Amino acid sequence: GVARTRAVETLPVHARMIDGLAARTGLDRDREVLPHPAEIDELVAVGHGLASPELAVLLAHTKLGIKAAVLRTDLPERPEFADRLPGYFPRALRERIPAAVAAHPLRREIVTTMLVNEVVDRAGITFVHRLGEDTGVGADDAVRAFRVAVTVFDLPALWARVAALPGTVPTAAADAIAV
């Protein structure tokens, strides 16, 4: 995917993210098989980025960190995100028991997971981190900013057009359009 394609150019950001996760969440580089600073220096020297398994670990920890930060806020209860919860459940349940769906005991966690997945899957592993570095906003405000951009620029329509491109479009070109 895009993260793998851009792994070399985003290695400095990935390194800062790993450092931040280690400091804030106790991420264990050895247990997670993530490179230490000296190993990152070696990757830079030879022009490599993180490998796919390392990116997968970074992706998982990034999503967990954003989710934890968002759950500490009122964002999952905000009216602008109310449409997320029903979409998680099959249509039959939404139609048959809408009140039970709306009152689901894990609704905050479900909404948060859906929001975090959309942000990271669409904007990339580094989006929330870079926005925080550049502007000082927290993860919840980064999620809000993403939703505003999605709405203002009608990004779902663009994503649908990219998805509809013929299979003959090179992956790198489709990735560049998606980013």
Predicted regions and their residues:
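Ligand/cofactor-recognition surfaces for anionic moieties
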Residues: 1-179
